[in-house]
Protein backbone atom coordinates (compact mmCIF):
# COMPACT_ATOMS: atom_id res chain seq x y z
CA UNK A 1 0.00 0.00 0.00
CA UNK A 2 1.31 3.44 -0.96
CA UNK A 3 2.19 5.79 1.89
CA UNK A 4 2.27 9.58 1.52
CA UNK A 5 3.74 11.95 4.10
CA UNK A 6 2.13 15.41 3.91
CA UNK A 7 4.10 18.50 4.93
CA UNK A 8 1.80 21.22 6.28
CA UNK A 9 1.83 24.76 7.61
CA UNK A 10 -0.93 23.89 10.12
CA UNK A 11 -3.70 21.33 10.44
CA UNK A 12 -6.73 20.16 12.36
CA UNK A 13 -7.85 20.71 15.09
CA UNK A 14 -7.37 24.31 13.90
CA UNK A 15 -10.18 25.39 11.58
CA UNK A 16 -9.37 27.23 8.35
CA UNK A 17 -9.82 26.79 4.64
CA UNK A 18 -6.29 25.36 4.63
CA UNK A 19 -7.07 22.67 7.21
CA UNK A 20 -10.40 21.74 5.63
CA UNK A 21 -8.80 21.26 2.21
CA UNK A 22 -6.08 19.18 3.85
CA UNK A 23 -8.67 17.03 5.58
CA UNK A 24 -10.50 16.46 2.29
CA UNK A 25 -7.30 15.45 0.48
CA UNK A 26 -6.20 13.07 3.22
CA UNK A 27 -9.64 11.51 3.64
CA UNK A 28 -10.01 11.02 -0.13
CA UNK A 29 -6.57 9.42 -0.22
CA UNK A 30 -7.58 7.02 2.54
CA UNK A 31 -10.72 6.12 0.60
CA UNK A 32 -8.50 5.31 -2.39
CA UNK A 33 -6.43 2.90 -0.29
CA UNK A 34 -3.50 5.25 0.33
CA UNK A 35 -2.01 5.53 3.81
CA UNK A 36 -1.46 9.12 4.90
CA UNK A 37 0.30 10.97 7.68
CA UNK A 38 1.02 14.65 8.24
CA UNK A 39 3.64 16.82 9.90
CA UNK A 40 3.19 20.53 10.66
CA UNK A 41 5.80 23.26 10.95
CA UNK A 42 6.44 25.80 13.68
CA UNK A 43 3.48 27.94 12.66
CA UNK A 44 0.93 25.41 13.90
CA UNK A 45 0.32 27.24 17.18
CA UNK A 46 -2.39 25.08 18.76
CA UNK A 47 -1.50 23.38 22.01
CA UNK A 48 -1.34 19.60 21.80
CA UNK A 49 0.81 16.48 22.05
CA UNK A 50 3.81 15.79 19.78
CA UNK A 51 1.69 13.31 17.82
CA UNK A 52 -2.02 14.00 17.50
CA UNK A 53 -4.87 12.09 15.86
CA UNK A 54 -7.83 14.18 14.72
CA UNK A 55 -10.78 12.76 12.78
CA UNK A 56 -8.82 9.59 12.09
CA UNK A 57 -5.81 11.51 10.73
CA UNK A 58 -2.39 11.48 12.39
CA UNK A 59 -0.29 14.64 12.60
CA UNK A 60 3.24 15.03 13.95
CA UNK A 61 4.25 18.42 15.34
CA UNK A 62 7.42 20.49 15.10
CA UNK A 63 7.71 22.00 18.56
CA UNK A 64 10.76 24.26 18.09
CA UNK A 65 10.16 27.91 19.04
CA UNK A 66 12.37 30.44 17.27
CA UNK A 67 13.15 34.09 18.02
CA UNK A 68 15.87 34.93 15.49
CA UNK A 69 15.71 37.92 13.11
CA UNK A 70 13.73 37.56 9.86
CA UNK A 71 15.32 35.49 7.09
CA UNK A 72 17.47 33.66 9.66
CA UNK A 73 14.29 32.64 11.48
CA UNK A 74 12.66 31.38 8.29
CA UNK A 75 15.71 29.29 7.43
CA UNK A 76 15.69 27.85 10.96
CA UNK A 77 12.02 26.99 10.46
CA UNK A 78 12.88 25.14 7.27
CA UNK A 79 15.67 23.20 8.95
CA UNK A 80 13.58 22.33 12.02
CA UNK A 81 10.79 21.02 9.80
CA UNK A 82 13.25 19.16 7.55
CA UNK A 83 14.68 17.37 10.58
CA UNK A 84 11.17 16.45 11.71
CA UNK A 85 10.27 15.14 8.26
CA UNK A 86 13.36 12.95 8.16
CA UNK A 87 12.64 11.61 11.64
CA UNK A 88 9.04 10.70 10.77
CA UNK A 89 10.04 9.30 7.36
CA UNK A 90 12.65 6.99 8.86
CA UNK A 91 10.07 5.61 11.29
CA UNK A 92 6.98 5.52 9.06
CA UNK A 93 8.65 4.76 5.69
CA UNK A 94 6.50 6.76 3.23
CA UNK A 95 6.76 6.28 -0.53
CA UNK A 96 6.20 9.94 -1.43
CA UNK A 97 6.68 13.28 0.29
CA UNK A 98 3.90 15.73 -0.55
CA UNK A 99 4.48 19.30 0.65
CA UNK A 100 1.76 21.94 0.68
CA UNK A 101 2.43 25.66 0.34
CA UNK A 102 3.82 27.95 1.68
CA UNK A 103 7.30 27.68 0.24
CA UNK A 104 8.83 27.16 3.70
CA UNK A 105 7.07 23.79 3.85
CA UNK A 106 8.02 23.15 0.25
CA UNK A 107 11.73 23.74 0.81
CA UNK A 108 11.76 21.64 3.99
CA UNK A 109 10.04 18.79 2.15
CA UNK A 110 12.32 19.13 -0.88
CA UNK A 111 15.49 19.03 1.21
CA UNK A 112 14.28 16.04 3.21
CA UNK A 113 13.16 14.15 0.10
CA UNK A 114 16.52 14.67 -1.61
CA UNK A 115 18.43 13.55 1.47
CA UNK A 116 16.22 10.45 1.75
CA UNK A 117 16.20 9.71 -2.00
CA UNK A 118 12.39 9.92 -2.24
CA UNK A 119 9.97 11.36 -4.82
CA UNK A 120 8.75 14.86 -3.96
CA UNK A 121 5.58 16.66 -5.04
CA UNK A 122 4.55 20.21 -4.17
CA UNK A 123 1.04 21.64 -3.96
CA UNK A 124 0.43 25.39 -4.32
CA UNK A 125 -2.83 26.71 -2.92
CA UNK A 126 -1.90 30.39 -3.25
CA UNK A 127 1.12 32.58 -3.83
CA UNK A 128 1.60 33.65 -0.23
CA UNK A 129 3.60 36.75 -1.14
CA UNK A 130 0.67 38.01 -3.23
CA UNK A 131 -1.79 37.07 -0.49
CA UNK A 132 0.25 39.18 1.94
CA UNK A 133 -0.06 42.15 -0.42
CA UNK A 134 -3.80 41.54 -0.70
CA UNK A 135 -4.40 41.46 3.05
CA UNK A 136 -2.13 44.40 3.78
CA UNK A 137 0.69 42.56 5.57
CA UNK A 138 3.20 42.80 2.71
CA UNK A 139 4.20 44.99 -0.20
CA UNK A 140 4.84 43.96 -3.79
CA UNK A 141 8.50 44.09 -4.75
CA UNK A 142 9.80 44.17 -1.17
CA UNK A 143 12.79 42.05 -0.17
CA UNK A 144 10.51 39.59 1.62
CA UNK A 145 8.22 39.42 -1.42
CA UNK A 146 11.10 38.70 -3.79
CA UNK A 147 12.76 36.17 -1.48
CA UNK A 148 9.49 34.29 -0.98
CA UNK A 149 8.92 34.10 -4.74
CA UNK A 150 12.51 33.02 -5.39
CA UNK A 151 12.22 30.28 -2.77
CA UNK A 152 9.01 28.95 -4.29
CA UNK A 153 10.50 29.06 -7.79
CA UNK A 154 13.34 26.89 -6.50
CA UNK A 155 10.93 24.37 -4.98
CA UNK A 156 8.80 24.21 -8.14
CA UNK A 157 11.85 23.76 -10.36
CA UNK A 158 13.19 20.86 -8.28
CA UNK A 159 9.88 19.07 -7.56
CA UNK A 160 9.04 15.88 -9.42
CA UNK A 161 5.46 17.11 -9.87
CA UNK A 162 3.49 20.22 -8.92
CA UNK A 163 -0.21 20.67 -8.16
CA UNK A 164 -1.98 24.03 -8.30
CA UNK A 165 -5.41 24.90 -6.97
CA UNK A 166 -6.45 26.74 -10.15
CA UNK A 167 -5.40 27.43 -13.73
CA UNK A 168 -4.37 30.98 -12.85
CA UNK A 169 -1.58 29.74 -10.59
CA UNK A 170 -0.48 27.19 -13.18
CA UNK A 171 -0.40 29.80 -15.93
CA UNK A 172 1.65 32.12 -13.72
CA UNK A 173 4.23 29.40 -13.07
CA UNK A 174 4.47 28.59 -16.77
CA UNK A 175 4.98 32.29 -17.53
CA UNK A 176 7.99 32.20 -15.19
CA UNK A 177 9.54 29.46 -17.30
CA UNK A 178 8.50 26.36 -15.35
CA UNK A 179 7.66 23.15 -17.20
CA UNK A 180 3.88 23.07 -17.65
CA UNK A 181 3.95 19.34 -18.35
CA UNK A 182 4.64 18.59 -14.69
CA UNK A 183 2.05 21.03 -13.28
CA UNK A 184 -1.37 19.45 -12.66
CA UNK A 185 -4.61 21.11 -11.59
CA UNK A 186 -6.03 20.06 -8.19
CA UNK A 187 -9.05 22.33 -7.60
CA UNK A 188 -11.20 22.71 -4.53
CA UNK A 189 -14.38 20.70 -4.36
CA UNK A 190 -17.35 19.95 -2.13
CA UNK A 191 -18.25 16.58 -0.62
CA UNK A 192 -22.03 16.85 -0.74
CA UNK A 193 -22.43 13.80 1.51
CA UNK A 194 -21.17 15.91 4.42
CA UNK A 195 -24.21 18.18 4.13
CA UNK A 196 -26.92 15.55 4.45
CA UNK A 197 -30.30 16.56 3.05
CA UNK A 198 -30.61 20.36 2.86
CA UNK A 199 -33.91 21.82 4.08
CA UNK A 200 -36.44 23.15 1.61
CA UNK A 201 -36.27 26.80 0.61
CA UNK A 202 -37.88 29.06 3.20
CA UNK A 203 -40.11 31.18 0.98
CA UNK A 204 -41.28 33.34 3.87
CA UNK A 205 -37.71 34.24 4.82
CA UNK A 206 -36.79 34.87 1.19
CA UNK A 207 -39.72 37.23 0.76
CA UNK A 208 -38.99 39.06 4.02
CA UNK A 209 -35.45 39.99 2.90
CA UNK A 210 -36.37 40.67 -0.70
CA UNK A 211 -34.59 37.77 -2.37
CA UNK A 212 -37.42 36.76 -4.66
CA UNK A 213 -37.66 33.45 -6.49
CA UNK A 214 -34.29 33.40 -8.28
CA UNK A 215 -31.14 31.49 -7.30
CA UNK A 216 -29.12 32.70 -4.31
CA UNK A 217 -25.34 32.54 -4.01
CA UNK A 218 -23.91 32.71 -0.50
CA UNK A 219 -20.28 33.39 0.43
CA UNK A 220 -18.54 32.43 3.66
CA UNK A 221 -14.92 33.52 3.83
CA UNK A 222 -12.50 36.41 4.05
CA UNK A 223 -13.18 39.69 2.25
CA UNK A 224 -9.86 40.30 0.52
CA UNK A 225 -9.40 41.67 -3.00
CA UNK A 226 -7.84 38.42 -4.21
CA UNK A 227 -11.00 36.44 -3.37
CA UNK A 228 -12.60 37.84 -6.55
CA UNK A 229 -15.92 38.79 -4.94
CA UNK A 230 -16.19 41.77 -7.28
CA UNK A 231 -16.21 39.32 -10.19
CA UNK A 232 -18.97 37.29 -8.53
CA UNK A 233 -21.10 40.38 -7.96
Question: Which residue ranges define each predicted feature?
Answer:
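Nucleotide-sugar donor phosphate/pyrophosphate-binding loop at the beta->alpha transition
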Residues: 77-81, 119-121, 129-154
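A short, charged, and often flexible helix/loop element on the N-terminal side
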Residues: 57-83, 136-143
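Carbohydrate-associated surface elements
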Residues: 168, 189
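An aromatic- and histidine-rich active-site surface loop
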Residues: 97-118, 122-131
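A short helix/loop element that forms part of the nucleotide-sugar donor recognition site in Leloir-type
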Residues: 196-211
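N-terminal subdomain of nucleotide-sugar transferases
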Residues: 1-64
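A short beta-strand/loop micro-motif in the catalytic core of glycosyltransferases
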Residues: 157-166
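Conserved donor-binding/catalytic core segment of Leloir-type glycosyltransferases
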Residues: 3-7, 211-227, 233
Amino acid sequence: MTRVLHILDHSLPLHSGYTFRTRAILKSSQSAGIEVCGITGNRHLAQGPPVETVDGLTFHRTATRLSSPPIIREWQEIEALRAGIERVAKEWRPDIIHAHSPALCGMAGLRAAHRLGMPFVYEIRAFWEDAAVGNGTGSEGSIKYRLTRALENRVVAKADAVFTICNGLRDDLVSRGHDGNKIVLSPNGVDLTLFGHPPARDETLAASIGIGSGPVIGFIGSFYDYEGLDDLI
